[in-house]
């Protein structure tokens, strides 16, 4: 059993009111993505539970590879689904966890219109479907990017709001995530929808997609190919980070214990480090070095100007959540080992 699999099982053993999910249908969009896929794995690790998990994604082949161990489990169902289109059919979904969103920066430059449409219209379509099909709670997976640029070095709380330059294509992601959050709260106010929101910090872990060009994915690929770690900035940006199993577990705490209409930051307060620190740690673990390269113009377009993005998690921790055992260096090592296992 891999270390990652142990993390999944340990997350599934958390002291949560799992009985709330009994005999319920749970829809997870973005199920082949980094966070959504991990969430599906944690839910399916409860073999004795009677709920059904509906994993929605665009790529059935990728889903089969990811969820092969569950594919013939009667409680697991794959739905071919593109978030930009309305959900078809008449299936009842008591819980909808909306984790589908293209968070890869390269697409912020290539397809900003599609990013906005999928984040806003996709959220509205899912809530409307749920309202007519037995929805009990809607969990929206937003992003820490909604905070924008803060002032000074203060950790963001859920009531903070920083500056986002809306007159740039790069704003397509944080601005549409903000709009989708407001949409959730508006549905709660006008139609009584029970909606909760999570704002994950920078999340890392195994099973990211091949098209994901976020910085940690690039670094991991360098390691897997036996290359030096390539950086295209000075890497001084400070970030809150969270291991994917910790993030998915936090989402379940919010789903089952969170207060209606509220938003919750997700971050590991013991994992605050710069992008350069991550690069140097991975290089050290792999016996390589960090090298610097000049970014291409297309890459510069999607660089964020946010130098400090650290999140306070008091509100989340008040629900009972805490990260799994192990420091971030160990969890990076788990990520590499799982990716190597997958490659073999």
Tell what function each PLM region has:
Residues 244, 277, 299-323:
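Conserved C-terminal active-site "lid" loop/helix of NAD(P)H-dependent oxidoreductases
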Residues 168-196, 224-225:
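Active-site Tyr-X1-5-Lys
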